[in-house]
Regions:
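Short interaction-hotspot residues at assembly and binding interfaces
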Residues: 23-50, 77-97, 140-163
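Homeobox/homeodomain signature
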Residues: 1, 5, 40, 53, ...
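Solvent-exposed, flexible loop/coil residues
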Residues: 10, 15, 41, 50, ...
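Intrinsic disorder/low-complexity segments
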Residues: 5, 17, 59-62, 67, ...
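Extreme N-terminal leader/activation tails
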Residues: 1-30, 35, 164-167
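Positively charged, aromatic-enriched nucleic acid-contacting surfaces
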Residues: 49-101, 106-128
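Intrinsically disordered, low-complexity charged/polar segments
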Residues: 114-167
């Protein structure tokens, strides 16, 4: 797959794969249509949906890793263009998209994996550096039964919502 053509679900997946310093596991929710991650980004735990292609809250994890970001003037109607260097990136990269967010995310994936990536590995997986290893259904069930992630904050919660029981 060409990184310049990634959109939606595939772009979300490859951004999660590119954040190997943040994401420990990738899962799929909503009948396999949405990327969900387990990880900790600089001390902030995350356990839930991860949709940077449609959410600046999720895309902020990429923006925070930009060491240099240059936004170019739009040359085509509706097209955004950026040039960026990222922490841990291999080189200065360019990204284009129908929005600045998509251009930024494509540039980030290109900085980690180059101009092309494989198809989405559509099963639960654990990240070890840039490698993804499938997690068996049994391992996923054992984690859920053990409750190791039950008390982690959800990114869907509201700021200031401590989720305490009403008095």
């Amino acid at each position: 797959m060409n990184v310049a053509d990634l959109t939606g679900f595939a772009l979300d997946y490859w951004v999660a794969r590119s954040l190997h310093d943040f994401v420990r596991e990738i899962h799929f929710t909503d009948s396999g249509e949405t990327v969900s991650i387990v990880g900790s980004d600089r001390g902030r735990p995350w356990d839930g949906r991860f949709t940077p292609s449609t959410s600046w809250e999720a895309a902020a994890a990429v923006l925070e890793r930009a060491q240099r970001l240059e936004v170019r003037e739009r040359t085509d109607p509706g097209a955004a263009h950026c040039v960026a260097d990222f922490e841990g990136g291999r080189r200065t990269v360019e990204g284009r998209g129908d929005s600045l967010r998509v251009a930024l995310l494509r540039a980030f994936v290109a900085s980690r994996f180059g101009d092309s990536v494989d198809d989405v590995l559509h099963e639960a997986q654990r990240l070890t550096g840039e490698r993804a290893e499938p997690i068996s259904d049994r391992q996923v069930d054992e984690q859920e039964a053990g409750g190791s992630f039950q008390n982690m904050p959800s990114p869907d919660g509201q700021i200031g919502d401590i989720r305490s029981e009403p008095r």
